Regions:
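Long, structured ligand/cofactor-binding scaffold of large enzymes
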Residues: 1-70
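Catalytic or ion-coupling anion/metal-binding cores of large enzyme and transporter domains
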Residues: 14-15, 19, 52, 58-64, ...
């Protein structure tokens, strides 16, 4: 095991100064143990903002047959609340707009088990990016933490790592420039977190792939935002999982020529081979819009340059901003 920290606990405190640093500590820890003990292959399990890219950075540096397993999302409560609801209600209570008994009720029901924040926040964004990158098994990014699907994901990953060892398939065979472009495309189509930008730049650097801010702008000009997911949308990752996860979305993007189907994945097959038998979303679902009727026709992520950030900065367009 290595360390991890929760931004959910440290947000708004001095503790956030340690958050991004923890990513490097995690990567260094994985590299140190595996390098010292001579492991032939690695399965890394993560499930929060910084430990997921930390795992991938460590696996990239080691470049031994590897798989990432996402720990999974927290399921929303019976009243459709989650961790973020608690934060919002705490703010309402602080302003005198909510009774203490109502706040306590929300606190008691909203986080009923393990897992990462249930919307398209950083954890689910990075889980989706890693699946699109090819470093986790198909379906891993959307499964609930306590589900039978997640247990099967773990078992299947154990079988898959043997195949990777037999074929000597390493992260450098999977994490190519084209694979990172796939990950960026999927993140944009899902309306993912701005943190994906800084994490994917670091992940690419670790594996020796040249990736920069302009790649996000270039890809964003042709990639629509199609997912109605929290925080700017209405739905949770568990709802998307019930409708097929991100695989049908990736199939659509592949069919539209926005993904590189030739990229190798931890299944031992290419992305196109993994997606060949994936069925489209049901017509009556309203979580993922059609390609021709997106929420936004171009990326919600914006790369900015100016006197405050001469080397670049990232911003996110949310809600109905910039949709005209």
């Amino acid at each position: 095991n290595t360390i991890t920290v929760s931004d959910g606990i440290s947000m708004g405190t001095q503790g956030m100064k340690y958050s991004l640093v923890s990513r490097e500590v995690i990567a260094d820890s994985i590299e140190t143990v595996v390098g010292c003990l001579g492991y032939d292959g690695v399965i890394a399990i993560g499930g929060c903002d910084k430990n997921m890219p930390g795992c991938i950075i460590g696996l990239a540096r080691l470049n031994r047959p590897s798989i990432f397993i996402y720990g999974g999302s927290i399921k929303p409560s019976s009243e459709n609340t989650d961790y973020v609801t608690v934060c919002e209600k705490t703010g309402e209570f602080s302003k005198g707009e909510l009774e203490e008994s109502d706040l306590i009720h929300v606190e008691k029901i909203s986080v009923k088990g393990p897992g990462s924040c249930g919307g398209m926040y950083t954890a689910n964004t990075m889980a989706s990016a890693i699946e699109a990158l090819g470093m986790s098994l198909p379906g891993s990014s959307s499964q609930d933490a306590t589900s039978e699907d997640k247990q099967k994901d773990c078992i299947d990953s154990g079988q898959a790592i043997i195949n990777l060892l037999d074929k000597d398939i390493k992260p450098s065979n999977i994490m190519t420039k084209e694979a990172f472009e796939n990950a960026i495309t999927v993140v944009i189509s899902l309306g993912g977190s701005t943190n994906a930008v800084l994490h994917m730049l670091a992940m690419a650097h670790a594996i020796g792939v040249q990736l920069d801010l302009d790649d996000f702008t270039r890809i964003g000009k042709k990639t629509p935002v199609m997912a109605d997911l929290k925080p700017f949308g209405s739905h949770y990752m568990s709802e998307l999982n019930a409708n097929g996860g991100i695989q049908p979305l990736m199939k659509t993007l592949l069919d539209k020529g926005l993904l590189h189907g030739e990229c190798l994945t931890v299944t031992g097959n290419t992305l196109a081979e993994n997606l060949s038998n994936v069925s489209p979303y049901a017509d009556n679902q309203n979580i993922i819009r059609s390609f021709d009727n997106p929420i936004k026709t171009t990326s919600h992520l914006r790369i900015l340059y100016g006197n405050l950030a001469s080397e670049g900065a990232v911003a996110k367009i949310t809600g109905k901003e910039g949709t005209s």
